[in-house]
Amino acid sequence: MSWQAYVDDHLMCDIDGHHLTAAAILGHDGSVWAQSSTFPKFKPEEITAIMKDFDEPGSLAPTGLHLGGTKYMVIQGEGGAVIRGKKGSGGVTVKKTSQALVFGIYEEPLTPGQCNMIVERLGDYLIDQGL
């Protein structure tokens, strides 16, 4: 299966008639493996800061998580494994695997829990596959 199919079929999937606003799978170096057409154009330093928070959980808390120029308030995640951010009625979930970062961005009516489930389920699958 291509990386794009993982984004299209697994991350941008339909849940009760709704889906993520945007999604992507990136390498730890910030290289794009696949992304939805709606995924924001991000800066390399934004991915570097996200990777740093996985190594040093809490490092993004004072500044927020930035992605494509949008600032998300960092909320509880799983240190070294999942970072979650909130902005207004939406937010972002980032799951780290051994080689990739899986991103999901959502807006209401999708809930944070639904976004977490979508992103973390694919991330856990990739981890199980050694990726």
Curated annotation (Swiss-Prot):
InterPro entries for this protein: PFN, PFN_euk, PFN_sf, Profilin_CS
Chief subcellular location: cytoplasm
Pfam family, any one: Profilin
Localization: Cytoplasm, Cytoskeleton
An example Gene Ontology CC term for this record: cytoskeleton
Single GO molecular function: actin monomer binding
Origin: domain of life: Eukaryota
UniProt keyword list: Actin-binding, Allergen, Cytoplasm, Cytoskeleton
Family: Belongs to the profilin family.
Subunit structure of this chain's protein: Occurs in many kinds of cells as a complex with monomeric actin in a 1:1 ratio.
Role of this protein: Binds to actin and affects the structure of the cytoskeleton. At high concentrations, profilin prevents the polymerization of actin, whereas it enhances it at low concentrations. By binding to PIP2, it inhibits the formation of IP3 and DG.
Protein name: Profilin
